[in-house]
UniProtKB/Swiss-Prot annotation:
Class of enzymatic activity (EC top level): hydrolase
GO MF, any single term: 2-hydroxy-3-keto-5-methylthiopentenyl-1-phosphate phosphatase activity
Pfam family, one: Hydrolase
Phylogenetic lineage: Bacteria, Pseudomonadati, Pseudomonadota, Gammaproteobacteria, Enterobacterales
Designated name of the protein: Enolase-phosphatase E1
InterPro entries for the chain: Enolase-ppase_E1, HAD-like_sf, HAD-SF_hydro_IA, HAD_sf
Catalytic activity annotation: 5-methylsulfanyl-2,3-dioxopentyl phosphate + H2O = 1,2-dihydroxy-5-(methylsulfanyl)pent-1-en-3-one + phosphate
Pathway named in the protein's UniProt entry: Amino-acid biosynthesis; L-methionine biosynthesis via salvage pathway; L-methionine from S-methyl-5-thio-alpha-D-ribose 1-phosphate: step 3/6; Amino-acid biosynthesis; L-methionine biosynthesis via salvage pathway; L-methionine from S-methyl-5-thio-alpha-D-ribose 1-phosphate: step 4/6
Length: 229
């Protein structure tokens, strides 16, 4: 029996276009002036130290680091440092109501129903935990954060790595066969399945005919009783 559901965000709870056409450009436009202005802030200083370590350039100056981060954005690299900095920039956007976090129309109600049924709900996304909380806390369906029991990002590993799902199961103290992972990306679901999890693929746009995972178009099409040990 499923005890907990772990969901991806981009393409799963949230339209990928919101991420790529709203969030990413917002951060890209503000990245350079933000880092120049805040490079001495304690949290930013720590992130820049991590970035220098990531690129193996311990003496890189701020302009070099800005160039590196723009390169990361160009290639959509899942850099933990980049995601953290983006999240800090997005916080201003949410607080100023420049945008609201998009969730598909049925998502909020289905999450609330599962929560009411006693299921534990978690998020696992390549975006930072801080960014995840902002998206759901300032969503166009209201504050959804009370529905979630926890959040995971790339600190536990990449989403296509089996070990990441093993770590999450261990941290939750829940047997893998009692966990359901929701994502639109087949390779992420493959990794979760290899870790012993149940999986369900959200098909919001183009079909994925190469996938062997159960598929639905909406959260309210997910029938939990079909996922048995």
């Amino acid at each position: 029996m499923i005890q907990a559901i772990v969901t991806d965000i981009e393409g799963t709870t949230t339209d990928i276009r919101f991420v790529h056409q709203v969030l990413f450009p917002y951060a890209r436009e503000r990245l350079t002036p933000f880092l120049r202005a805040h490079q001495q802030d304690d949290d930013i200083t720590a992130l820049l130290v991590d970035l220098r370590r990531e690129i193996a350039q311990p003496d890189a100056d701020i302009e070099t680091l800005i160039t590196v981060l723009h390169g990361f954005m160009d290639e959509d690299r899942k850099s933990t440092v980049l995601k953290a900095i983006q999240g800090i920039i997005w916080r201003t956007g949410y607080l100023q109501a420049d945008f609201r976090g998009h969730v598909y129309p049925e998502v909020a109600q289905q999450l609330a129903d599962w929560h009411q049924q006693g299921l534990k709900l978690y998020v696992y996304s390549s975006g930072s935990v801080a960014a995840q909380k902002l998206l759901f806390g300032y969503s166009d369906a209201g504050d959804l954060c009370p529905l979630f029991s926890g959040y995971f990002d790339t600190h536990v590993g990449a989403k296509r790595d089996v070990s990441a799902y093993q770590k999450i199961a261990n941290q939750l103290g829940i047997a893998p066969q009692a966990l359901l992972f929701l994502s639109d990306i087949r390779q992420e679901l493959d990794a979760a399945q290899l870790a012993g999890w149940h999986t369900c693929q959200l098909i919001r746009d183009l079909p994925d005919n190469d996938s062997a995972h159960p598929q639905v178009n909406r959260f309210d099409q997910i029938v939990l009783s079909l996922f048995t040990e």
